[in-house]
């Protein structure tokens, strides 16, 4: 043992930083924190570590485990009158699918009062209009309240945000009631989301549900001064909500106490991976002390499942319906229109009282295209339209959203910045002007036309430029009983025939 409290496997020179350590060779011990070569053994825990930095991180985890309830210490109390058979029947009726941990997964609840939530939180839910939980909330909330890690999937607009905010607020409230002398007010939970708009929305909902409780939030996104965000955290908050890039930037420049984080949430995790945030997410996670992990997404891919497995050893999978198929509440109308005719077709729709159902969102593929099309709509049709995309300043984006959601502007032209997560409560029509690059993104985009199962319409422009999506698009249209343009059928059949010839059928 040396003076730093580490027993070296080989050398007596103790490395200070994890980055200074090499990767392990076959058969060599691995650091329990970062998986680099576990050159040393921590005296206090007898675990392999690679450096003093990782030893300190390990000891913080141990201290955190002494302070906080174990994951088996439930905030949710199972109804003694319910049986596993009753739970199976209810799940079958509501199309709820659960995998992992078997009987450890609590049954779905039919009311929020069944979850053992603080009375003030129940009142806030009622005031906010949450009369009864949605299917994803019925299963995800009690599962999350047990402290187990969770990967949950449901249609866009199905209430996923409350599915993680309710457990977070409940756990934070319980923690403060059990530790009244703790005046530090260090963060107890963190939510990461892929866009600034979604982060703003999550914080708004968190403030509404946490009103009157010992629950404060900090919004950490680009476009706002970092100094104000840092000051807010230093004043004491329970929940940090931010985009991965901004949170990494904040942590790299300032010391933020994250050892008390009990719950770590990734919202719209598939979108986060698509945007290349995986490394930043992992960097943030490694700064935490083994929190409960909650992942939410409208679609589930192998990559999403892989990320879930890397963040939590054991994870419960909860899905409502088929997470990779279009929302059945959205009526899809596919229109074959050549690229040069798309603008005129859009103008015709917006002029038609039969086809235009404002307020509507028009999705395009480029930021410049969004600005130009919004201006053209206003000039040509007389229908006021605004655009929104990632290049606009945060204040302007907030003003645009306020005008649209407030009913001042009937048409919003958007890039994929609004394709994920953001609640567009007033929208019942989506026009897909430019097809997304993947069918999963298409499913997200048209899902904006429905909220909480209410009927909506998605008008989709299709032409030969979208050839790579034809088979998946036909399947998506068929799954909801939508009519398929004959041009799309003919070209899809021809593509399949040529493919068979190429592979030797």
Swiss-Prot record:
Residues 342-492 form the Helicase C-terminal domain. This is DEAD-box ATP-dependent RNA helicase 41. The Q motif is unique to and characteristic of the DEAD box family of RNA helicases and controls ATP binding and hydrolysis. GO terms for molecular function: ATP binding; ATP hydrolysis activity; RNA binding; RNA helicase activity; zinc ion binding. Belongs to the DEAD box helicase family. DDX59 subfamily. PANTHER family: ATP-DEPENDENT RNA HELICASE DBP3. A motif (Q motif) lies at residues 110-138. Its EC number is 3.6.4.13. A zinc finger (HIT-type) spans 27-56. ATP binds at residues 154-161. Residues 141-318 form the Helicase ATP-binding domain. It catalyses: ATP + H2O = ADP + phosphate + H(+). A motif (DEAD box) lies at residues 267-270. The keyword Metal-binding applies. It holds the Pfam family DEAD. It comes from the Eukaryota. Keywords: ATP-binding, Helicase, Hydrolase, Metal-binding, Nucleotide-binding, RNA-binding, Zinc, Zinc-finger. InterPro entries: DEAD/DEAH_box_helicase_dom (IPR011545), Helicase_ATP-bd (IPR014001), Helicase_C-like (IPR001650), P-loop_NTPase (IPR027417), RNA_helicase_DEAD_Q_motif (IPR014014), Znf_HIT (IPR007529). The lineage of its organism: Eukaryota, Viridiplantae, Streptophyta, Embryophyta, Tracheophyta.
């Amino acid at each position: 043992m040396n003076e730093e409290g580490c027993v070296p496997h080989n050398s007596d020179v103790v490395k200070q930083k994890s980055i200074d350590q090499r990767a392990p060779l076959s058969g060599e011990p691995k650091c329990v924190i970062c998986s680099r070569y576990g050159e040393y053994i921590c005296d206090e825990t007898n675990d392999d570590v690679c450096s003093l930095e990782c030893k300190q991180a390990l000891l913080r985890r141990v201290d955190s485990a002494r302070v906080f309830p174990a994951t088996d210490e439930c905030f949710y109390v199972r109804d003694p009158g319910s049986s596993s058979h009753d739970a199976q029947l209810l799940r079958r009726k509501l199309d709820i699918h659960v995998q992992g941990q078997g009987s450890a997964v609590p049954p779905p609840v039919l009311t929020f009062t069944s979850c053992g939530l603080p009375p003030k939180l129940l009142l806030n839910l009622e005031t906010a209009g949450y009369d009864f939980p949605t299917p994803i909330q019925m299963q995800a909330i009690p599962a999350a309240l047990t402290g187990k890690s969770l990967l949950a999937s449901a249609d866009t607009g199905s209430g996923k945000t409350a599915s993680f905010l309710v457990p977070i607020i409940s756990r934070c409230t319980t923690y403060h009631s059990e530790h009244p002398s703790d005046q530090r007010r260090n963060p107890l939970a963190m939510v990461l989301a892929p866009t600034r708009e979604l982060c703003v929305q999550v914080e708004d909902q968190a403030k509404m549900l946490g009103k009157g409780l010992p629950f404060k939030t900090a919004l950490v996104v680009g476009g706002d001064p970092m100094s104000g965000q840092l000051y807010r955290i230093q004043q004491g908050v329970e929940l940090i909500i931010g985009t991965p890039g901004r949170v990494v930037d904040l942590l790299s420049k300032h010391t933020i106490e994250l050892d008390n984080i009990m719950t770590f949430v990734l919202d719209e995790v598939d979108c986060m991976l698509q945007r290349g945030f995986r490394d930043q997410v992992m960097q943030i996670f490694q700064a935490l002390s083994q929190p409960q992990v909650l992942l939410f997404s409208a679609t589930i891919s192998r990559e999403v499942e892989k990320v879930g497995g890397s963040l939590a050893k054991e994870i419960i999978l909860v899905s409502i319906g088929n997470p990779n198929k279009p929302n059945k509440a959205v009526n899809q109308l596919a229109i074959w229109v050549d690229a040069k005719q798309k603008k005129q077709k859009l103008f015709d729709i917006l002029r038609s009282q039969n086809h235009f159902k404002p307020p509507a969102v028009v999705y395009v593929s480029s930021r410049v295209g969004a600005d130009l099309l919004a201006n053209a709509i206003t000039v040509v049709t007389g229908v006021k339209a605004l655009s929104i995309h990632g290049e606009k300043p945060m204040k302007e984006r907030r003003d645009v959203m306020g005008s649209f959601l407030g009913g001042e502007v009937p048409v919003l032209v958007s890039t994929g910045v609004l394709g994920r997560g953001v609640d567009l409560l007033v929208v019942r029509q989506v026009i897909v002007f430019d097809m997304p690059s993947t069918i999963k993104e298409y499913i997200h985009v048209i899902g904006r036309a429905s909220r909480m199962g209410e009927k909506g319409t998605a008008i989709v422009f299709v032409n030969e430029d979208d050839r790579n999506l034809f088979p998946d698009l036909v399947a998506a249209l068929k799954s909801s009983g939508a009519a398929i343009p004959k041009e799309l059928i003919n070209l899809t059949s021809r593509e399949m025939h040529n493919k068979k010839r190429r592979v030797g059928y």
